[in-house]
């Protein structure tokens, strides 16, 4: 039987999930700040009022480096948000603490490598391998959640 919510708070699973989650959200903020800095450095603004403030409407334009940052951030949203849900629910299933921590750590490290590979323009297939590696624990957690939910129908 899974431990009670009180035991989970004192256990090792939920705190590990919360740590990884908070670090991933901070990483997303860092990518957003980097995007803003690249916009300023490249003078490539999405909105006319921003371009006007920084030199004129000619700077309301796209830039490949800004677009790369935006894609990295969008990819974070496509993967980290589901992880936040899956990891939270998974934490309450009473998983083995070591296995759960490995799920969270593999996802966290995969996303860190993915971001470095994306923003650093590292050679393929670094980014896609990091992406795939990070998706494995999510798939595992999702299947375990589905299994537990179906078992209790």
Swiss-Prot record:
InterPro entries: MAPEG-like_dom_sf (IPR023352), Membr-assoc_MAPEG (IPR001129), MGST1-like (IPR040162)
Subcellular location: Membrane; Cytoplasm, Perinuclear region
Positions contributing to glutathione binding: 39, 74-78, 114, 118, 127-131
Keywords: Cytoplasm, Fatty acid biosynthesis, Fatty acid metabolism, Isomerase, Lipid biosynthesis, Lipid metabolism, Membrane, Oxidoreductase, Prostaglandin biosynthesis, Prostaglandin metabolism, Transferase, Transmembrane, Transmembrane helix
GO cellular component, one term: perinuclear region of cytoplasm
Cytoplasmic topological domain: 43-61, 121-124
Reactions this protein catalyses: prostaglandin H2 = prostaglandin E2; 2-glyceryl-prostaglandin H2 = 2-glyceryl-prostaglandin E2; prostaglandin G2 = (15S)-15-hydroperoxy-prostaglandin E2; 1-chloro-2,4-dinitrobenzene + glutathione = 2,4-dinitrophenyl-S-glutathione + chloride + H(+)
Segments on the Lumenal face: 1-13, 92-96
Documented EC number(s): 5.3.99.3, 1.11.1.-, 2.5.1.18
Predominant subcellular localization, coarse grouping: membrane
Residues the UniProt record annotates as site (Essential for protaglandin-E synthase activity): 50, 127
Subunit organization: Homotrimer.
Family: Belongs to the MAPEG family.
Function in brief: Terminal enzyme of the cyclooxygenase (COX)-2-mediated prostaglandin E2 (PGE2) biosynthetic pathway. Catalyzes the glutathione-dependent oxidoreduction of prostaglandin endoperoxide H2 (PGH2) to prostaglandin E2 (PGE2) in response to inflammatory stimuli. Plays a key role in inflammation response, fever and pain. Also catalyzes the oxidoreduction of endocannabinoids into prostaglandin glycerol esters and PGG2 into 15-hydroperoxy-PGE2.
Name of the featured protein: Prostaglandin E synthase
Organism: Bos taurus (Bovine)
Gene that specifies this protein: PTGES
């Amino acid at each position: 039987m899974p431990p009670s919510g009180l035991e989970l708070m004192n256990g090792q699973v939920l705190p590990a999930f919360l740590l990884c989650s908070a670090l991933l959200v901070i990483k997303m903020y860092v990518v957003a700040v980097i995007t803003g800095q690249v916009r300023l450095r490249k003078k490539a603004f999405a909105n006319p009022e921003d371009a006007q403030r920084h030199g004129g409407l000619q700077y309301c334009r796209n830039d490949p480096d800004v677009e790369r940052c935006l894609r990295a951030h969008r990819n974070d949203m496509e993967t980290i948000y589901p992880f936040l849900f899956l990891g939270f629910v998974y934490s309450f299933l009473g998983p083995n603490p070591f296995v759960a921590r490995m799920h969270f750590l593999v996802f966290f490290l995969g996303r860190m490598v993915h971001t470095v590979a994306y923003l650093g323009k590292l050679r393929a297939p670094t980014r896609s391998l990091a992406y795939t590696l990070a998706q494995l624990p999510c798939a595992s957690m999702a299947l375990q959640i589905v299994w537990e939910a179906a078992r209790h129908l």
